[in-house]
Amino acid sequence: MSKFEAFAEDLGRNYVIRVGYKDKSWFMKFLGLLMFFNRGFMTHYITTIGNTVYFPNEDFIKKNELGAITVLAHEVVHIAQKEKRGFALFAFEYLFPQCLTIFALLTLLAFVWLPFLWCLLFLLFLAPIPAPWRKKFEVEGYTMTLYMSDLIMRQIGHDDDYILKELSLSAVRIDRLNFRGSGYWYMWPWGVDEEFAKKIEDIRSGVISDTDEVYGRVRRSYLNAVSAYEL
């Protein structure tokens, strides 16, 4: 059993979680067509639908097992968010405001009542309008990414200065590509760098482990996976 498999199995004791692969899923291939604005959706991004975490392919995990473990931990945060808020509410909040575009379909009723043509205005929500809930959920998810990076680097034996430098660089990349960039459709261009700077302080001081049980569970699962793999 690989370290990744041991980690996923241990996480399964606390969360209903499955691992799938985009290159083997027709649904993911269809979704990839809809995500035209994110060219790396099928090859570089991991997506959670329900309780299934879809990786691009099996080689993605084999080539960077520790990276895949970090990503799975990130997606567990989204699963926990969904369990807390309920699937329907979580999905609406995460996709808002772009999900409002669906009401443009009411235009099809214009042949019954002409004013339905005004529903074409809902297509404006396809624009990269800031998404406050998506931003909130992804800050929580990427905080887990930084937390796992810190945990793994400490376990490997890197010194504090190196870890702080790497976490800071990672936070800058995450903000630029995923919050300010097209990865999540320019979801939030303001102040995320400052939020991550504070999160890194909380991670390094140990505060963050005491504020959310998800971190404790993920940490235990990772350490259990490392121990099982070394045996």
Predicted regions: what they are:
Residues E75-L95:
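Catalytic Zn2+-binding segment of zinc metalloproteases
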Residues M1-N57:
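Auxiliary, metal-adjacent structural segments of Zn-dependent hydrolase domains
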Residues Y45-L72, F87:
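Short pre-active-site segment immediately N-terminal to the catalytic Zn-binding motif
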Residues S25-W26, R85-G86, Y184, E213:
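Coil-to-alpha-helix initiation sites in intrinsically disordered, low-complexity, charged segments
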Residues F4-A8, P97-L231:
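Metalloprotease/metallohydrolase-associated module, dominated by Zn2+-dependent proteases
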Residues S25-W26, Y94-P97:
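Acidic helix-start/capping segments at beta-turn-to-alpha-helix junctions
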Residues H74, H78, K135-E138:
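Histidine-centered active-site/metal-ligand motif
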